Amino acid sequence: MGITELAVLRWLHIIAMVYWLGGEWGVFNTSTHVINRNLSMEERRRHMQTAYHIDILARIGIISLLPLGMHMGYLWGVQPYGGDFLVAVWVLAIGWLALCISAYFYRETDRGIQLTLWDERVRFVLIPVMVIASISSLLGYGPFNVGPMQYWFSIKILLYSVTLMIGLKLRFIMREWTTLFRVLAEGPNQEAENQLEKSLALGKRLAYFYWITIASVAFFGATKAV
């Protein structure tokens, strides 16, 4: 068969999925030490930095899946928009990646928080667009093709948008870490400690649903069952 455009895209898609799922698992485990009051603040901050280092790979993975998926969808014939549309998708995705990576490098600064807010605004626009497009397609109104063995693409887009919603809430939680650790750096603060534990407990509950949804995205992409 040789090396084809579709084969390369599938390879990149697999890598993105691996870093997405693996990265989220790494953050999940590392975050436990962030709220451990028995550790020194320096040690807890070190674990928080480790979580950020792992999380950026997951963020790169989840963003990369969008242009890769749309590109492969065109080659598979389940989404009809190629040419300039795909170019625009790739350009916008690269811009989104640049924004996300910049927020990572400027983390724990006011500039980093502002960049993170812009990253969140992108999701606020993208999520409803994807939800509407996927549901509309499943109902037969487009923009994606539906028919025998074609529904999987719209289902996958819908599930992907759900992961973005969950991921957005997890972003809120990680952004809150930065604010709370600024407070804790000034000295012991029971209220900040309690809020840190509360937000992390919520994040861990969300993580279980997150992994199930990610696995479902992978299932429909791999099996194309409907």
For the regions a protein language model found, what residue spans apply to each?
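Polytopic transmembrane helical bundles with strong interfacial aromatic enrichment
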Residues: 2-226
